[in-house]
Every structure is written in structure tokens, then in C-alpha cells.
Design a protein with these regions (language model features):
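C-terminal substrate-recognition/cap domain of FAD-linked oxidoreductases
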Residues: 85-86, 92-321, 327-329, 333-336, ...
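FAD-binding subdomain of flavoenzyme oxidoreductases
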Residues: 1-141, 148
Length: 354
């Protein structure tokens, strides 16, 4: 999550079966411990020696290649394995996120954090995304638990297929959803926003959550956005349903098309989003892709999964040029082609570009 960061930051030790078939404990090592490990004269020692020599020899180049984003799952995390400043060599940084390609993880030790039981949401409706970079920076100053978003297409689909939410909510749940959306429906009569921002806060008390929401709302007033406070998890449910279920609804309603996740996990540093998002939408429109844009705004991580009739040669012909245009756009802003979903067959050919 935005508040806690990536799993990799909470892994303290692993047990891993490497290519020799033996299980090894993997954890951060000090420089003396690393030297001792490399001197063992066995498979494990040779592994550490080769990897250390590799990252030390190319240290500056590896550090310079790190994408300018808070999320990235392209390639291997070589830049976090060896830190000259601290003298720590941490092989867990390489194993986490490698998806079993370097070894089989059999045991994981994690650092835990206490939960905060109360949660609330501030929803912002942006008709003009020009000040988006400033808004994002202002929101991040308040250290929210999560910072999500979805676009006007997602909102439109949610409203269009609203009765179908009964499948997930039941009749009574659907009725409550419809009632809760009445104020939002009246607000939407004044115009559909280009982007809906969802800023979530957690706290030890309900009062703490409400104070955080109110403080952020006051700071965002100069941007002239319509805003809605949903101080409890129950009140904020309607927006989470739209954010999470609209694509599933679209997929279930369009019977002759299939999901095509080829530009589904891109990341761009949030300050660039006001320039990036309009250019991205132009590419989507150019290739006539039926797609919504939703994602993790605080990290600039977006999930775009078009519905396409892949068996149609004309549709299939769109895949490569559309992907290359989107990828080039992402890399123009020094982003990543995958924040969460790793490389796979689709993105592996583009690792070298990163």
C-alpha cells in the first residue's frame, strides 16, 4: 500500500532452495559476514561471491538504471542488493519479486506493523486535470493510507451497469448503494469529472480519521474541486465498488471480447501525470481500444486492460504498435512498464529498454 510500501521492505529472512537442491537461510549480511560467506568454498559461497563481484563491478551503472518511481517489478532488483554506504549485502532484495526464477522460497519471516481499526475516505471529483500534479503532492503531504483513482469511463460504466452490482451486493445491498449515490447523482448533473480521486486515511479513533479528512479537504479547497467526505468504511463502500468491480462488469457484459493485458501495469512518477494521462488517452483512442484507466494514484501506477476481439486479425494487429507507443511514452517520463505484475512473456522483450 502507499502507507506501508512494498512487501520487500518487510521481509527480514527467507529460506530458499537454490539450483543445487539444498535449502539455505537468506538474510542481510554485514561486510565481515559477507566476506566469511564468500570464503566457504561451496555452492553457497560461490553464489555470493559471483553476485557480489557482479554488483560491485557495475555498481554505478546499476544504481543509475533504477527507474524514477516508487513501484517497479521489471527485471531483478540488483540495485538494492549491495549498499556501499551501509556495508550491507541483502540477497532477500533480489529473491523477493523474482517469482521463483532464482529459487524456491520455502519460508518467510516478515516484520509486522500494528493495524489501525478506523478508516475514512475523501473523494475528489476533478473536471480539470491540469493541477493534478499539485493536488497529488498536496495529498501526499498528508501521508494517506491509500490514494486511488479511476477515470470518467470507469464512472460511466459503473452507472451504466449499476443494476448488475446486485450480483456482488444482493438486492438489499444494491438498494443501499442506489440510495447512497443520490447526492453524487445530483452533483454529476453539473458535469462528469475527468478523474475521481479516493484518499483513504486510517486511525486509532474515528475522531482521528475525521480530523485527517477535514484537514486535507481544507488544503484542497483552493483547487475548486467538488469533494465528498465518507468518514466510515460503510459510507465509502460505493466508491470502492466502482473502483474494483467496474471492469469485471464490463468484461461480463461484452461477450464477444476478451481481456488483453498488454499495457496493464505501467508506472509514471505522479508529478508527470498531468502531461502523461492525456497523451495516454490519445493512444487508447487512436487504436480504438475499449478500456478504462484506474490505479494507485499515489504511486502513479495504472491498470489498463482493454477488451479486444483477439481472434480478429485487425484487432490483433493493434497489439504491438499500441504497446510500443505506450511503452515509449512511459519511458519518456522515466517510468516503469510494470509496477506490480512482473515481466512475463509480454514485457520481457522490453526489459533491455528499461
Amino acid at each position: 500500500s502507499l502507507e506501508y510500501g512494498k512487501t520487500i521492505n518487510f521481509v527480514t529472512e527467507l529460506k530458499v532452495v537454490f539450483a543445487d537442491g539444498k535449502e539455505y537461510a537468506v538474510k542481510p549480511l554485514t561486510k565481515p559476514q559477507l566476506v566469511a560467506k564468500m570464503s566457504q568454498g561451496d555452492y553457497e559461497g560461490d553464489l555470493y561471491k559471483k553476485l557480489f563481484n557482479l554488483v560491485e563491478k557495475h555498481y554505478d551503472e546499476i544504481k543509475a538504471a533504477k527507474p524514477n518511481v516508487t513501484k517497479n517489478s521489471m527485471g531483478y532488483y540488483l540495485w538494492d542488493v549491495w549498499d556501499r554506504n551501509t556495508g550491507i549485502f541483502d540477497l532477500t532484495k533480489l529473491i523477493v519479486g523474482s517469482q521463483g526464477t532464482l529459487g524456491f522460497v520455502t519460508d518467510i519471516k516478515l516484520r509486522l506493523v500494528p493495524t489501525r481499526p478506523y478508516t475514512g475516505l475523501l473523494v475528489c471529483f476533478m473536471k480539470n486535470i491540469k493541477p493534478l500534479g499539485e493536488v497529488i503532492n498536496k495529498v501526499l503531504e498528508h501521508k494517506p493510507a491509500t490514494f486511488e483513482s479511476f477515470d470518467d469511463n470507469t464512472l460511466y460504466l459503473s452507472l451504466r451497469f449499476l443494476p448488475s452490482f446486485r450480483k456482488y451486493l444482493g438486492w438489499w445491498g444494491l438498494v443501499k448503494l442506489l440510495v447512497s449515490l443520490i447526492p453524487d447523482g445530483l452533483m454529476l448533473l453539473k458535469g462528469i469529472p475527468k478523474l475521481i480521486l479516493m484518499v483513504e486515511f486510517n486511525g486509532q479513533t474515528q475522531e482521528e480519521v475525521e480530523q485527517k479528512i477535514n484537514t486535507l479537504r481544507d488544503d484542497l479547497k483552493p483547487y475548486g474541486m467538488a469533494m465528498e467526505r465518507d468518514e466510515t468504511a460503510a459510507k465509502s463502500q460505493k466508491f470502492w465498488i466502482m473502483r474494483r468491480q467496474s471492469f469485471n462488469l464490463l468484461r461480463s457484459k461484452v461477450k464477444d471480447k476478451h481481456t488483453a493485458p498488454f499495457i496493464d501495469d505501467l508506472v509514471v512518477n505522479p508529478p508527470y501525470l498531468p502531461q502523461f494521462l492525456p497523451r495516454l488517452r490519445k493512444i487508447i483512442k487512436k487504436y480504438k481500444l475499449q478500456a478504462t484507466i484506474a490505479g494507485h494514484m499515489g504511486d502513479g501506477n495504472f491498470h489498463i486492460i482493454p477488451l479486444m476481439k483477439i481472434e480478429d486479425p485487425k484487432e490483433k494487429a493493434k497489439l504491438l504498435p499500441a504497446m510500443e507507443e505506450v511503452d515509449d511514452l512511459v519511458l519518456h517520463y522515466k517510468g516503469s512498464l510494470s509496477g506490480e505484475h512482473n515481466d512475463g512473456l509480454v514485457r520481457t522483450p522490453y526489459v533491455a529498454k528499461m
